[in-house]
C-alpha cells in the first residue's frame, strides 16, 4: 500500500522527536511504499518570517543574528540526532550546502532591502528543506 506520512513542526522539535519520526517511518516502510512530508522544525518558519521582516526593516545585524540562530539549531540537531559518525558527516555536508544557499538568498534580499512574495516562499521553503535533511539522515542512521 502507498502511504503518505506528514509530520508537523512539533513532531520535529528535538533530536529525540526526529529519531522517533524516523522510527515511525521505518516501521511503516516494511510493508508499504512511503512518502514522507515534513514541516519545518518547530519555530523555524516563524524565525524565517522574522528574518523577512527584519530585512524589510533594514536591520542587517538582526538578520545575521536570526539566521545564525537557525543554522546553529539545525547543526546542533544534526549532531544530536544522528549517532553514526559517517552518516552524521554526510548530513552536515548536506546541511552546509543548503545553508550556503540560504545565506546567499538572505544576503541578496538584504542588499535589495525587500522581500517579494516569490522570494518569501523561497525563503520559507528552507525550513522544510532543512528538516527533510534531518529526517532523511536520521532514517539512514536507524537502518
Model feature map: region roles:
Residues 1-143:
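Nucleotide/pyrophosphate-binding catalytic subdomain
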